[in-house]
Amino acid sequence: MANYFNTLNLRQQLAQLGKCRFMGRDEFADGASYLQGKKVVIVGCGAQGLNQGLNMRDSGLDISYALRKEAIAEKRASWRKATENGFKVGTYEELIPQADLVVNLTPDKQHSDVVRTVQPLMKDGAALGYSHGFNIVEVGEQIRKDITVVMVAPKCPGTEVREEYKRGFGVPTLIAVHPENDPKGEGMAIAKAWAAATGGHRAGVLESSFVAEVKSDLMGEQTILCGMLQAGSLLCFDKLVEEGTDPAYAEKLIQFGWETITEALKQGGITLMMDRLSNPAKLRAYALSEQLKEIMAPLFQKHMDDIISGEFSSGMMADWANDDKKLLTWREETGKTAFETAPQYEGKIGEQEYFDKGVLMIAMVKAGVELAFETMVDSGIIEESAYYESLHELPLIANTIARKRLYEMNVVISDTAEYGNYLFSYACVPLLKPFMAELQPGDLGKAIPEGAVDNAQLHDVNEAIRSHAIEQVGKKLRGYMTDMKRIAVAG
């Protein structure tokens, strides 16, 4: 099979990369009615599989789970989760032939095997759903022409999808129809009903494409969402300890610092995050972020180039075929780092202390968010898509580090995200070491003293922060998410 994106001509590539439309709430007036009375079979009962299924059932849909015979016979975790929540469970052969919509929510590396197994069992005219388009775009999976192929991609982990639904809300969601597989022209109706059934329409839905979702998702997770947080954690911890900070305190400042800092980001964008600093600290954080952007821009561009060309995907799939040798080696090495093995700090760190002593961390967040956003937009991805794949998801990933450091982040994210994270962080850490060596007192671990600032300089910096394109689009999109709960509880 050939990478689907690479089979398109340039005009088609640009059209699909640039497909992005914020949908009005009135477009979801019918809710999930298009799928009511139809059979929806979910393959996979992980975090997305279970929680989307719970929401869809609560929205009045007929949901069951198709699992492998071995998973049922051995009563594995997927079988237990589905049955304990009262769902009908059966084998592929028992459930797939009756399904009107088969939703594939297994991990990326299992998609080809799953799709090749279920396709012959699917009835004529059925629909196949994904929550990530890697299998279609990067693997180039060929789907029977009578089958409609759609995507509903919540921009949150599965647990958040469920919790926001239970609160009567939802999470921002991308939906798409594969242009090669919409024989009856009903793909958008199916995708809208599925999104409404998960609650996504209450938080904002973007009509996107499989291509735009995949390319932007890969870029975000590799760079700012995971790679930058991992590289920043390792670099900042080593710098603090090198300068005599208690390793336990240093570890806590970083582990919970990302979460606390990005909670401000979630509520009010880069503007609010920077406003939490004193004026002298804000000017310093801005200067550091500009230096970081200049240093890291080529690395961000390389990741985007490799994602667009398919180089990243082909390398990762080669590692799949080699039993994940690179992935598992990098995972083991990360677990042995000084940050991951540092003792726990039992003392209290106040919320403002994370900002005052984390000026460099704030600069890293600002630089990483803006670079990821700018690089995606420069590659043809529309601003709304770039926002969701950079700034929006960052607090959610930071929250995983607050739970169990980098180990938890890498367990929770997909193997695809984890592989890309290691590629980025392994390149970024040595790239930034000369920069780290030139830091000044107050950049990390100590507060910058209050003092006089130049009013004109402060005015210009504030204008530069607020006028960035990500702040403009973010203000609009956050207007649809005002009811989402706080994530951070600083340690």
From Swiss-Prot:
Native organism taxonomy: Bacteria, Pseudomonadati, Pseudomonadota, Gammaproteobacteria, Enterobacterales
Q: Where does Mg(2+) 1 bind?
A: D217, E221
Q: What does this protein do?
A: Involved in the biosynthesis of branched-chain amino acids (BCAA). Catalyzes an alkyl-migration followed by a ketol-acid reduction of (S)-2-acetolactate (S2AL) to yield (R)-2,3-dihydroxy-isovalerate. In the isomerase reaction, S2AL is rearranged via a Mg-dependent methyl migration to produce 3-hydroxy-3-methyl-2-ketobutyrate (HMKB). In the reductase reaction, this 2-ketoacid undergoes a metal-dependent reduction by NADPH to yield (R)-2,3-dihydroxy-isovalerate.
Please list the residues that make up the active site.
H132
Per the annotation, how and in what number is the cofactor bound?
Answer: Binds 2 magnesium ions per subunit.
Give the CC-aspect GO terms. cytosol
- Pfam families from the xrefs? KARI_C (PF01450), KARI_N (PF07991)
Which pathway does this polypeptide act in? Amino-acid biosynthesis; L-isoleucine biosynthesis; L-isoleucine from 2-oxobutanoate: step 2/4; Amino-acid biosynthesis; L-valine biosynthesis; L-valine from pyruvate: step 2/4
Q: Which residues form a coiled coil?
A: none
Q: Which UniProt keywords apply?
A: Amino-acid biosynthesis, Branched-chain amino acid biosynthesis, Magnesium, Metal-binding, NADP, Oxidoreductase, Repeat
Q: Entry's HAMAP family? A: IlvC
Please tell me where Mg(2+) 2 binds in this chain.
Answer: D217, E389, E393
UniProt-recorded name of the protein: Ketol-acid reductoisomerase (NADP(+))
Q: Where is the KARI N-terminal Rossmann domain?
A: 15-208
> Which SUPFAM superfamilies does the record cross-reference, listed alphabetically?
6-phosphogluconate dehydrogenase C-terminal domain-like, NAD(P)-binding Rossmann-fold domains
Q: Could you tell me which residue ranges the KARI C-terminal knotted domain spans?
A: 209-344, 345-484
